[in-house]
Amino acid sequence: VQYGETDYDFLCRMAAEEGIFFYEEHAQKSTDQSLVLCDTVLYLPESFEIPWNPNTRTEVSTLCISQFRYSAQIRPSSVVTKDYTFKRPGWAGRFDQEGQHQDYQRTQYEVYDYPGRFKGAHGQNFARWQMDGWRNNAEVARGTSRSPEIWPGRRIVLTGHPQANLNREWQVVASELHGEQPQAVPGRRGSGTTLDNHFAVIPADRTWRPQPLLKPLVDGPQSAVVTGPAGEEIFCDEHGRVRVKFNWDRYNPSNQDSSCWIRVAQAWAGTGFGNLAIPRVGQEVIVDFLNGDPDQPIIMGRTYHQENRTPGSLPGTKTQMTIRSKTYKGSGFNELKFDDATGKEQVYIHAQKNMNTEVLNNRTTDVINNHAEKIGNNQAITVTNNQILNIGVNQIQTVGVNQVETVGSNQIIKVGSNQVEKVGIIRALTVGVAYQTTVGGIMNTSVALLQSSQVGLHKSLMVGMGYSVNVGNNVTFSVGKTMKENTGQTAVYSAGEHLELCCGKARLVLTKDGSIFLNGTHIHLEGESDVNGDAPVINWNCGATQPVPDAPVPKDLPPGMPDMRQF
């Protein structure tokens, strides 16, 4: 990123970072000029020889070097660069580079560069080029010549110097030309045109590279607006990064190409856990820069403004802390709100659609006062093992239509005092095997109309003391085969008007006027000891017998009940 620097400074800094040097070339037969970018001395033009001659006054016609001074300086001996990338957080991100040609100095002068401005293996080249840049003037010679052909980008071979080790190939790294062409005053001789070339060279067995240049730093955080494609509300990549448009940006439109992808700082960030809130298109964010580097922006926060207002209405809701989202391309929201107003403290949760709660172990809810739940549609509760419900005082359960209760095994209901069950129309009870009712004191059964009892096999009734049956009108017993009655002491059968015992054609009738009628095909009287009969008049075989009277017809015999007179 070019930030706070001229175009030339930006290009020079980028070239130095990539180990590139550049020079100008002038065409020999035209005015054309070329800018040559190069990263190695090997591809410079072929070198040419130029002699050493300190006596320029006597040999002015020959291009030569009249001054040549060689010096060596202490420079950094090694470079260690290090950087970090969030895409490979476990990567060491370190590269070391030792300097070369260190015959004239010690080797413990290290340069440590962090951040190294690299995100991969290219950092090794950065370290090497930086090392070359720091040592680009460790060995340098400065000279003077009248030759205009000594300029950066050329190589020369010095010859004839009395110090033999200087007669070698050199790379020209700097050149400063000074020329004079004085005007001749009439009547005077004047002086001739002169050209002096003050140059600097380094040994040509190494590549000269520019020293690392300082990168402009951002003074502090900046404000920006999140951008994205037209019609999109949330625009991010797989890392949760977004794009923004800075307020100072005059050229880029507010779309998906406004900036590079920018990381977003979250309140908590762990491996698969933490907090995640993606800034949405149109929100104002605060962008800071790691180490002040314009190339490493990071969103540190968000802020409201006149058009993006806060939840609630300030300052009236100043006691509320709110986390409220917004439905994607909609008007709904989810919300978690804490209200700390004195005497009105509240925690409020709003789910726009579904709300799921998952507890892997225990959950305890403690409500000191009241608890109310309202469900608009259905509710399903599944308990894998046991459920205990304790109610201190009363429970009222109202079912609007139907209720189905299924118990897989046993059910025990204990009522400490009273139980009242009221069924408006019909109640049906089906027991698969056995049914037992135990009443400690008194049990009353009241049926307003009809009661029917059906037993598939046997029915047994056991009464500890007394047994009383009171029927308002009629009683009918129908036994398919045999009926036995056994009384331990006394059996009394009483009828107000008519008592009749029938078996086939035999009948025994007792009426309320004291008449006894015994009618049958054959009548046998046998006494083990005696047969006694007393009456004032005894008629025997004289036609004085009367017909047996019929029983009165029941007036309210229920439908389907048999008429006992037919037997």
Where are these regions (language model features)?
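Intrinsic-disorder/coil detector with helix-boundary
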Residues: 34-35, 44-48, 489-491, 497-567
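Acidic, low-complexity/disordered segments
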Residues: 163-224, 300-306, 310-321, 553-556
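Glycine- and acidic
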Residues: 134-141, 158, 205-211, 227, ...
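Hydrophobic alpha-helical scaffolding
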Residues: 1-4, 67-74, 136-146, 212-216, ...
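Extended, domain-scale alpha-helical bundle/helix-rich regions
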Residues: 1-204
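Short helix/loop capping segments that flank catalytic or ligand/cofactor-binding pockets
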Residues: 23, 45-48, 76-83, 89-95, ...
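Extended boundary segments
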Residues: 87-119, 207-250, 320
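Structural signature for extended repeat/solenoid scaffolds and their inter-repeat hinge/linker regions
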Residues: 20, 24, 29, 37-40, ...
